[in-house]
């Protein structure tokens, strides 16, 4: 693996916002050796032309790849192709409607260079949503823990809730931990990675990683209405199926309290 960082952006029909995303990458990727792979999952709304445009105008930064299979599949295929194409030591992900913050990649890669015992570096993030009046509101989401050495601590610290995009991973480990096509595929990916590759480090000194845009996402209101019970049930079932020897269980005490334990 060569020194550097690869950012993978899966793209499908995001013509309204993809320029904002790519401009944030162009302006904020920092000084660490860097490459951004845009994997287009057969867009039909003009997003493809924008991806090609940035590839041509900024060939030292962007690589545009289009999957042609006559119909959108899922982000899983696009992300996995980006992983397979990555040749740098570190890798990360950004959704096509989110934005990259200045300093995040340099900060994460430098930390992992200096602390090779950790497999992942994560930050808090900024969440941008539309309120009931249609106005854009921003809040930050951060976490109280730094070093995480075991899986239960990871869950209690909320490390699985930090957007998987707000993290820097080691590429050679990610290549052995591809995305699978199931519910909460991003959380499943991150939990599997953490389970296999502890310890990880959460830098709670800043939320400057990504801007998680949800003013474009019509499904977000539906997603936040799902109960914790149903989400945890589906996630744990998937982990048991995909991780041989997975030895953790959970039990709800009431609507707000869940007990996690090792079997």
Give, region by region, the residue ranges found by the protein language model.
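A conserved acidic beta->alpha catalytic loop
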Residues: 24, 40-50, 95
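Short, well-formed alpha-helical segments that are part of the catalytic scaffolds
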Residues: 14-27
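Conserved nucleotide-sugar donor-binding catalytic segment
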Residues: 147-228
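Short beta-strand/loop segment that forms part of the nucleotide-sugar
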Residues: 33-42, 63-68, 96
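Short aromatic/hydrophobic "clamp" motif used to bind/position activated sugar donors
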Residues: 91
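Short, flexible, basic/aromatic active-site loop/helix in glycosyltransferases
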Residues: 69, 124, 138-159
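Conserved donor NDP-sugar-binding/catalytic core segment of glycosyltransferases
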Residues: 103-137
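Glycine-rich, basic loop-to-helix element that forms the pyrophosphate-binding segment
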Residues: 68-86
């Amino acid at each position: 693996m060569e020194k550097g960082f690869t950012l993978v952006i899966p793209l499908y029909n995001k013509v309204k916002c993809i320029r904002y995303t790519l401009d944030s990458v162009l302006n904020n990727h920092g000084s660490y050796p860097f490459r951004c792979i845009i994997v287009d999952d057969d867009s039909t709304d003009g997003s493809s032309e924008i991806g090609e445009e940035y590839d041509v105008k900024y060939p030292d930064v962007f690589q545009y790849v289009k999957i042609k299979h006559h119909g959108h599949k899922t982000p899983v295929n696009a992300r996995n192709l980006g992983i397979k194409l990555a040749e740098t030591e570190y890798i990360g992900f950004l959704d096509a409607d989110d934005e990259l913050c200045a300093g995040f990649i340099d900060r994460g890669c430098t930390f992992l260079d200096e602390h090779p015992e950790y497999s992942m570096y994560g930050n808090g993030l900024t969440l941008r949503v539309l309120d009931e009046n249609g106005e854009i509101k921003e809040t930050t989401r951060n976490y109280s823990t730094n070093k995480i050495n075991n899986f239960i601590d990871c869950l209690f610290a909320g490390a699985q809730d930090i957007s998987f995009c707000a993290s820097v991973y080691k590429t050679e480990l990610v290549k052995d931990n591809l995305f699978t096509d199931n519910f909460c595929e991003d959380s499943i990916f991150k939990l599997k990675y953490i389970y296999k590759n502890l310890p990880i480090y959460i830098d709670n000194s800043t939320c400057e990683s990504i801007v998680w845009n949800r003013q474009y996402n019509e499904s977000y209101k539906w997603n936040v209405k799902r109960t914790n019970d149903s989400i945890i049930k589906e996630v744990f079932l998937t982990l048991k199926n995909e991780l041989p020897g997975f030895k953790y269980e959970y039990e709800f005490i009431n609507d707000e309290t869940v007990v996690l334990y090792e079997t």
